[in-house]
A protein has these predicted regions:
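Metalloprotease/metallohydrolase-associated module, dominated by Zn2+-dependent proteases
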Residues: 2-71, 87-134
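Active-site recognition of the HExxH zinc-binding catalytic motif
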Residues: 74-86
Length: 134
């Protein structure tokens, strides 16, 4: 187990309300998060599990309801890492060239390493990938 693996914080149930107005390392803020039964589509019209809008360093997430705990956790890791990577002009070198598959792989790795997404684990995620500050 590496140093990052020692910080595994696993919550039994993910309460999305704990992420509202959450300040993350790197100066990012999750201003809102909601679950929806409405269809979500990505920028090119494909069905999506989630959609994140980033205005500067503020994120608003909409996630399809009905996901199981693991799917919700991986989705949170994926959306936050991707949003952080595109929200700033010069993201860390380790994520600069990430594509959708890379974000998904990183999200699965984060879930395997730290367990269910939580405020502390999302901060570990952004720190691990090189986002620093606030």
């Amino acid at each position: 187990m590496d140093d990052w693996g020692k910080w595994r914080l696993n919550l039994a149930v993910i309460d999305i309300n704990q992420f509202k107005n959450l300040q993350l390392q790197g100066g990012f803020i999750i201003t809102d998060i909601e679950l929806t039964d409405a269809p979500i589509v990505d920028a090119i019209g494909r069905e999506a599990i989630a959609q994140t809008s980033a205005i500067a360093r503020e994120f608003r997430l909409i996630i399809r309801s009905g996901l199981n705990e693991e799917e919700l956790s991986i989705t949170l890791y994926h959306e936050i890492l991707e949003a952080a990577s595109v929200a700033i002009a010069n993201p860390p070198a380790g994520v600069m060239d990430f594509n959708e598959a890379d974000f998904e792989r990183a999200a699965h790795n984060a879930h395997d390493r730290w367990g269910n997404a939580s405020p502390a684990n999302l901060n570990l995620l952004v720190q691990f990938h090189g986002f620093r500050g606030q």
